[in-house]
Amino acid sequence: MAISKIAFLALIALSGLCGLASATYKVGVGRADITGPPVEINFMGYANIKQVGRGIHTRVFARAFVVEDEKGNRVAFVSADAGMMGYGLKREVIKRLQARYGNLYHTDNVAISGTHTHGAPGGFLMHLLYDISILGFVPQTFEVMAQGLYLCIKRATDNLVDGRIFLSKTTVLNVNINRSPTSYLRNPEEERAQYEHDTDKTLTQLRFVDLENNLLGAFNWYAVHATSMNNTNRLVTSDNVGYAALLLEKEYNPNKMPGKGKFVGAFCSSNLGDVSPNIMGPKCSISGNECDLLTSRCPAGEGECFASGPGRDMVESTQILGQRLADAALGLLNEQSQESTAREVTGDVRFIHQFVDMPNYNGSAYNPLSRKIDKIRGCQPAMGYSFAAGTTDGPGAFSFEQGTTTDNPMWNFVRDFIATPTQEDIKCHEPKPILLATGRATFPYEWQPKIVSDQLLKIGDVIIAAVPCEFTTMAGRRLRNQIRAAASAAGGLDTEVIIAGLTNIYTSYTVTPEEYQAQRYEAASTIFGPHTHSIYMDVFERLTKALMRNETVEPGPSPPYMNDVMLSLNTGVLFDGHPINTDFGYVKTQPEKEYGINDTVKVTYISGNPRNNLFTEKTYFTVERKINEDRWKVAYTDASWETKMIWHRTNTILGFSDLEIYWNISPQTLPGVYRIRHSGEYKYILGGKYPYEGLSHSFTVKED
């Protein structure tokens, strides 16, 4: 009997130890296609009116994870291959979730973050400044994104299983550089001395497994702009981080097409504000000389100041950097058996959210410039002169220079024609000279948000800080430290803080007060003035303390509902036509009879406008391999890295168009007989849309 009691007590003790060592959550992951209209719509990111879509290189996806603790507390996080997120879009996603699940999901426990690709269709942000280069609101983009964001959370919910979560980190070099290094140097020397690099090089991974240790998903946060593809790109692309996600998913979803398979792998944005993937640095495009460090300008005759990546062109640079990120994430996942770098995430799930009226925020904060406690306040939104200069990833127009702290009467006249800043605005934003007084512009609707979304998701001892903008490197480091210290003061030991950038609503950039004085692009785009970062530090410290103490906060004022005032200059598809003696799907250019490794296959079809049907979760074409006389198997789709689809309007009056399909035969391609099939829809001049299909001749890919 005594032995039995001892054994029983030992079992209880062991179970207690096991409870400390591991934690069970309900975890689920999901993915959905959010590819918008691939042609005739401007891309969001570079604000380049000439960057109009002409086809697809890779489709873009939204990837979600859902976590629930033993008490039923639940959070959902989404990383979307999009430039950023708009609150009108999030509000629509919540509406659809609540129509299905009731109040299970709401504003407070759902975070939606953009990867910041600059190669996807725009027109979904519902603020004029961000949609104006897209020629306004694009309902088709908004709808496919809203449904895809909803679907990825729904699929993650449907896939919930008992599981565990592990956190691991690794250093990834040769992927990013600071594109405003002179601004970074404005930060205190003693602060900079705490860090080896002027950008964050740490990749942070959350790994989701079931109770049998089967891998479900991996979400990775790394600070880098998704701007390997520059503003000359016209094909939809998820860019470097999106390609990394495709590689990661391919590894764990063997024999599946891109965007398919149970494993979900994401590369999410972090404090990437001043971080560029163009690691070869900025050079003058004609002379090859280095640009001026302060202004990012080149002398007359030496071209534009442009930074480039490690590849021979932007596509190869995207591929190289995506591979480096994927390799880093795979390295962490492949160590899961030893768990040498990973630690298990334990603890409950919590969330907190607050809307903040930034222009009317008043508080106090430590001023690193004066080294005193100052009263702080937000400003009405405004963009500075250096905003128009662009960045070394994508230069702007006219003669604007980065680092501009003085105004110009001519540009002030243009500014005042749109909206005139008050003297209070001008004083509030100093030393930023105001180029666009967006907070004073109301026609035809709000130009930039005034109310922001600040949110924290706590999963055990991990806190995800969902910020509504692009924090620079040091701005993000300070915020992480502030949240960690606040959590520690409230009893949270060894809290890991992850910054999720461009989340829930978009308000451009946030720099440190010191960086603000330099007025490079990021500072000129810090829309609420020099105290913007200090306000976020104040708000997130307060939210962290409330979160850790399980306290509630006032929800704050909701952003305005603007769905019914949206305007657009984009026209729909009127009709499609085809030349006499042809039909839709007719193959104008057949493939050659034989190809080798590294050759490129090209097939051209008479097509309808791709905007007639987005083929969401499907494909505009397939590359098919012959298995036997009766069976062909899909080898590649329009989501594959190896393929491209380019659409051309050949006759505007008659509505003629061609679709070119390219397949680059990679070394991994199996030899055999192939063909290419195109599916589309055309719009009849008298009304209605009708499907069509075209099929190329078969051709042979020979052994290398």
Curated annotation (Swiss-Prot):
Keywords: Glycoprotein, Hydrolase, Lipid metabolism, Secreted, Signal, Sphingolipid metabolism. It holds the Pfam family Ceramidse_alk_C. It is an enzyme of class 3 (hydrolase). N-glycosylated. The keyword Hydrolase applies. One of its GO terms (biological process) is long-chain fatty acid biosynthetic process. Glycans are attached at residues 230, 362, 550, 598. Coiled coil: none annotated. Hydrolyzes the sphingolipid ceramide into sphingosine and free fatty acid at an optimal pH of 6.5-7.5. Acts as a key regulator of sphingolipid signaling metabolites by generating sphingosine at the cell surface. This is Neutral ceramidase. The gene is CDase.
